[in-house]
Amino acid sequence: MYEGVVQDLIDELGRLPGVGPKSAQRIAFHILQAEPTDVRRLAQCLMEVKAKVRFCATCGNVAQEELCNICRDPRRDLSVICVVEEPKDVVAIERTREFRGKYHVLGGAISPIEGVGPDDLRIRELLARLADGTVTELILATDPNLEGEATATYLARMIKPMGLKVTRLASGLPVGGDLEYADEVTLGRAFEGRRLLDV
């Protein structure tokens, strides 16, 4: 244990996802040894992100305006929506350059153990987007784990009566893995080989 503010910094850094106690300590000491201008720039960036970034009113992706760059892009295919759990999944898919449609970010996955049900996700907003008949295909790109599969099955059953083509990313993604960690080639092939969901 360190004194006062040093330990406070280590504790706060350790609360970040994927940062364990040793990494938190290493980052804290890097900050302590950094130039004051670098530390101020980091602090300013953190404050600006918190103040300026919001969620897109249409898809739920991160944005600095009411709509994200993807929803504002007129070159995107309006007939296909790819449903993902989190904004970081949008970034992973965009890196593949395989998908030219729009996205819908649910804000998580159905997880009874964590107390997350369908009403806690952006499913109503998705249904509202599908209501005008523009969308012909819905790609379910939730994580290939228990919660992601449950969410995909729930959505497929709910949307099937609408007559839309509902597909799921092909295998090649590790079961139990997170979409954000898949490499571009694997994710690109999963898009190319997506399958029709029959529920």
Curated annotation (Swiss-Prot):
Zinc finger (C4-type): 56-71
Keywords tagged on the record: DNA damage, DNA recombination, DNA repair, Metal-binding, Zinc, Zinc-finger
Presence of keyword Calcium: no
Lineage: Bacteria, Bacillati, Actinomycetota, Actinomycetes, Kitasatosporales
Domain Toprim intervals: 79-174
Pfam family, one: RecR_C
GO process annotations (BP): DNA recombination; DNA repair
Keyword check for Magnesium: no
Gene name as annotated: recR
Any one GO molecular function term: DNA binding
Protein name: Recombination protein RecR
